[in-house]
Structures are given as structure tokens and as C-alpha cells.
């Protein structure tokens, strides 16, 4: 009963990823036709399945290349509006910022996960997710190594292309760097990997939903990242000052920026004027307050509807509003899903349907303001802004410093976001796909594994 419940729940449309499901469907055919040949040698069957799976990933790899090519043509001439075959097959597909060596990634993951050797369990959602993750890491590190090997003898456009490499890595907090509701401690395996990334000259950012404004908020983020910041402050830390100060924290999706400061031995709050994107600076405070007030009232309605008055608390901040369980209580998973979907629908209404409002100043034409609603696992939040803006803000802020012209500009193909929430609705990492390459993990353990691959590929 439990197993069936989980399967049916996981197949809810808003929790699917169409690209992964489509690839999984392609792999189902060779599995059904060839994986259960009881009259053949097991090794031969495995090799046959591997060859067929490899061919599928090679074909998908070619479709990705074609999609990138047509996207580039469309950017040069928007009137063309050419649609790739892959987008026809998977309409919800986003934009690829790098090619994906899916076939090679499959071989590596097949060696680890023995996908081709399975006779009764077909290639799964998680198998495909991990293959896509590995392919993205391979693509980014291939660019990195090509850059290092082609410093001389290149000019013009080719030089610009060769100078592209991974420069910025951002992370979600809960479930990505540390377990849900926990924090980084000095013994965390993630800490040494983050320190290694900083030592390689990469910028490391934490883009989290947790929002604590002003310098007083630095203490809250220190509590979350204690193990890492304590290491940076320790006598045995070998990082140079500029490498330490390549650590940034973006709070409340895209609302509060902090940067490690070596003199303060901690995080320094960065004033909005130094990093807000132009479109964000133009957002009307009245519009933001209207959105927050409307969603606050909607959460009160939902809380009353589910009889959660005694077991939950609604919190309203400057740029976010959420509902959290009281100590010793919890909100059922189905209730969390209902609330986040209801909030998303409410947002869609007030962001697009100005005719529903009697007062034109309330209608606001608020479609220029970005807002996201997400399920945090035990709570539901609605934030002004989103992680696409958070990542883009980091890309632009870093390049305000004239001393780092050698790494600027930082493009989307030179940025990587690692997170656990990539469902199309109710997940706040999903929007990061608009501003960076992404890796979809399910636990801090997977984060450690993917960072080990990343570091090995860079140094290998």
C-alpha cells in the first residue's frame, strides 16, 4: 500500500520533469525487448542493452546540439522562430547553455549503477537524472580544460569562446549543503569540497530561500554555514584572502546579499544599491506590498480551511510570507502541496489578470515583478524574486569589481547551480535554469559525489 501510494504521488503532473520522463520512455523499449532474454548469457545481454542505451543517449545528444544551434539562429534573427525537433517532442524544454555529452555520461553512470545489467528494473527517473547531472559536469569541465590548454595563439571570437569556463557555482541550502533544517558543521564532508572550489579560484554562492535582512542577518547565515565560515577563520586555512572573499550568500531567493569579509571574519551585508539588477530597482514598493498582503490573506484562508489554526504560524516579512508548523506539529504533505499550488494559482491571477481589480492602482501591471511560491518540505513560502534573479545578480555583482576583469562577464554557460527542487511547480530551484546550468541532487551526499566528480574532472 505504501509503495503504491508513493508511486502514484510521484507521478502527479506538477512533480514530473518532462525531459527526464521522455528519455526514460525511450530507454523502456530496449529494456522490454532485450533485457529479459533468459536464454542468453547475462554478460551478452548486458552488453547488448548497454549498446542500445548508448545509441539512444547519442541520439538525444545530437538533438540537444541541434536545439542549441537553432536557439542561436533565433537569437540572431528572432523572426525565424525555428523550433527544434527536441522541443517539438518535449514542449516544456528549457534552454541549454552547453552541449551535453550524454553518451559518455551514461557509460560512466552505467559503470557505477549497473543499469545495463538489470533484468527486472528498467532505467529509472533517478538513473536519467544522474546521467544528466554527470553530462552537465563533463560539459563544464571540458570547457574548463580546453581553456587552460588554449591560452596562446587565439584571437577574436575564437579567443572569447576559449576563455569561457566555469566561474561561478551556486548552491541551495537545505537538502543540498546540509540536511533539511540542519546546518553545516566543521565535520561536514561538503565543507572541504567548498574550500577546494574556492582554492581553484571559483566563486561559490549559497542562494537560499532563508531571508534575513541587514547586517543583523549575517549571524543567522553564520548559523547555517558555521562549519565553512569557521574553517575560513581558522589558522590552518590555506586560502588566500581574495579566495575567501569569493564566498557569497544570496538570501530570500534574490533579496539580500552577503559576502565573506576577511577583516570582519564573517559575512558582510551588501547594500541593495550595489547589486540590485536594474529591473529590480524599478519594482514598485506599493506593488510588492500588495502582493504580500494578498498572499498573507490567502494563507490565512488556507490555514482556516485545513483547520490548522492551532498547529501553524503565518510569518510575514518585507519580501516574503509563509506558513510554518508550530513546535511539535507538522503539516501533512498533501496539505503542503495543496497550499503551494493554491498560492501559485493566486499569484498567477494577480500577476496576469488586471481586469479582476476595481482599482487600477491595485491592478498595477504587476507582471514585471517576479514572485515564486514553493514547498520547503515542512512549510510553504511565497517570495518576491526568484533564484533566476538571485544567480543573475551574483553574476553581475561580481563583475562590478574592476580587479576581476579577467573573469568577466560571467555567462550562463559559465555558471552552475546545484539544488534539490526542480519540479515545475512549487520548487524554487527550477527558476535557476533560466540563469545557469543546473544539477539536480536529492541529498547532501549526492552533492558531495557530484563535487568530487567536478573537482576530479577539472584536475584530471
Swiss-Prot record:
It comes from Candida albicans (strain SC5314 / ATCC MYA-2876) (Yeast). This is IMP-specific 5'-nucleotidase 1. One of its GO terms (molecular function) is magnesium ion binding. It catalyses: IMP + H2O = inosine + phosphate. InterPro entries: HAD-like_sf, ISN1. It comes from the Eukaryota. The active site is at 172 (nucleophile), 174 (proton donor). The lineage of its organism: Eukaryota, Fungi, Dikarya, Ascomycota, Saccharomycotina. Belongs to the ISN1 family. It holds the Pfam family ISN1. IMP-specific 5'-nucleotidase involved in IMP (inositol monophosphate) degradation. Keywords: ATP-binding, Hydrolase, Magnesium, Metal-binding, Nucleotide metabolism, Nucleotide-binding. The gene is ISN1. ATP binds at residue 112.
Amino acid at each position: 500500500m505504501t509503495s503504491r501510494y508513493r508511486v502514484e504521488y510521484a507521478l502527479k503532473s506538477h512533480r514530473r520533469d518532462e525531459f527526464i520522463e521522455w528519455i526514460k520512455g525511450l530507454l523502456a523499449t530496449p529494456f522490454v525487448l532485450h533485457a529479459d532474454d533468459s536464454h542468453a548469457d547475462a554478460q551478452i545481454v548486458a552488453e547488448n542493452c548497454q549498446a542500445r542505451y548508448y545509441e539512444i543517449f547519442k541520439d538525444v545528444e545530437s538533438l540537444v546540439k541541434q536545439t542549441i544551434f537553432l536557439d542561436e539562429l533565433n537569437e540572431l534573427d528572432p523572426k525565424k522562430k525555428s523550433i527544434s525537433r527536441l522541443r517539438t517532442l518535449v514542449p516544456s524544454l528549457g534552454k541549454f547553455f552547453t552541449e551535453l555529452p550524454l553518451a559518455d555520461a551514461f557509460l560512466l553512470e552505467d559503470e557505477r549503477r549497473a543499469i545495463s545489467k538489470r533484468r527486472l528494473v528498467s532505467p529509472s527517473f533517478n538513473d536519467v537524472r544522474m546521467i544528466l547531472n554527470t553530462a552537465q559536469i563533463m560539459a563544464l569541465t571540458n570547457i574548463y580544460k580546453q581553456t587552460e590548454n588554449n591560452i596562446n595563439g587565439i584571437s577574436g571570437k575564437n579567443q572569447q569562446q576559449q576563455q569561457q569556463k566555469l566561474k561561478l557555482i551556486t548552491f541551495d541550502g537545505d537538502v543540498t549543503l546540509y540536511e533539511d533544517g540542519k546546518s553545516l558543521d566543521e565535520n561536514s564532508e561538503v565543507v572541504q569540497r567548498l574550500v577546494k572550489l574556492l582554492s581553484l579560484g571559483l566563486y561559490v554562492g549559497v542562494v537560499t530561500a532563508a531571508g534575513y535582512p541587514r547586517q543583523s542577518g549575517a549571524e543567522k547565515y553564520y548559523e547555517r554555514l558555521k562549519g565553512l565560515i569557521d574553517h575560513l577563520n581558522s589558522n590552518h586555512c590555506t586560502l588566500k584572502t581574495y579566495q575567501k572573499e569569493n564566498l557569497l550568500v544570496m538570501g530570500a531567493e534574490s533579496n539580500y546579499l552577503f559576502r565573506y569579509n576577511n577583516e570582519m571574519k564573517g559575512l558582510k551585508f551588501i547594500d541593495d544599491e550595489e547589486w540590485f539588477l536594474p529591473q529590480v530597482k524599478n519594482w514598485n514598493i506599493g506593488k510588492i506590498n500588495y502582493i504580500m498582503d494578498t498572499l498573507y490573506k490567502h494563507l490565512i484562508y488556507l490555514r482556516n480551511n485545513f483547520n490548522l489554526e492551532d498547529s501553524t504560524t503565518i510569518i510575514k516579512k518585507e519580501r516574503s510570507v509563509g506558513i510554518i508548523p508550530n513546535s511539535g506539529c507538522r503539516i501533512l504533505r498533501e496539505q503542503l502541496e495543496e497550499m503551494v499550488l493554491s498560492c501559485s494559482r493566486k499569484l498567477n491571477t494577480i500577476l496576469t489578470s488586471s481586469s479582476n481589480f476595481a482599482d487600477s492602482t491595485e491592478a498595477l501591471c504587476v507582471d514585471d515583478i517576479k514572485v515564486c511560491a514553493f514547498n520547503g518540505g515542512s512549510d510553504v513560502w511565497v517570495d518576491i524574486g526568484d533564484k533566476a534573479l538571485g544567480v543573475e545578480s551574483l553574476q553581475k555583482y561580481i563583475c562590478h569589481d574592476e580587479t576581476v576583469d579577467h573573469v568577466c562577464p560571467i555567462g550562463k554557460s559559465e555558471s552552475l547551480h546545484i539544488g534539490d527542487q526542480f519540479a515545475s511547480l512549487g520548487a524554487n530551484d527550477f527558476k535557476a535554469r533560466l540563469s545557469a546550468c543546473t544539477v539536480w541532487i536529492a541529498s547532501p551526499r549526492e552533492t558531495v559525489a557530484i563535487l568530487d566528480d567536478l573537482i576530479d574532472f577539472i584536475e584530471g
